[in-house]
Amino acid sequence: MGWKSQNTLKGENNDMASKRKMVFGYRMEFGDIIPSPNEAETVQYIYATYLTGASFQHLAKELDKRDVPYDAGKRWNVNMVARILEDSRYIGTEVYPALISAEQLQAVQERRKQKRSIP
């Protein structure tokens, strides 16, 4: 991966990138972005559990209870869960390998849209 690609990735998601340096679920190995096994499993768990009806709050508490690491010294919160559930990179791009299916992402987006439209 060239200099330009690395800089583009670095600035792609500033709030997460500045703290994590890499999108949750991935790591850099020999210049390539590959799934980080434990984090990728957590991403898959978040999508699957949300699609069974769990709330952001429930997911954040469950991940904390299970001592799933996010960043050193940080506890999971609803914003972290929301960012993961909103991130389309998890279905795969030229740079990021797929961790979830496009159907899962679409189902999550539909559920979120329905929740927002309920009075």
Model-flagged regions — what are they?
Residues 1-119:
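Conserved catalytic breakage-reunion loop centered on the nucleophilic residue
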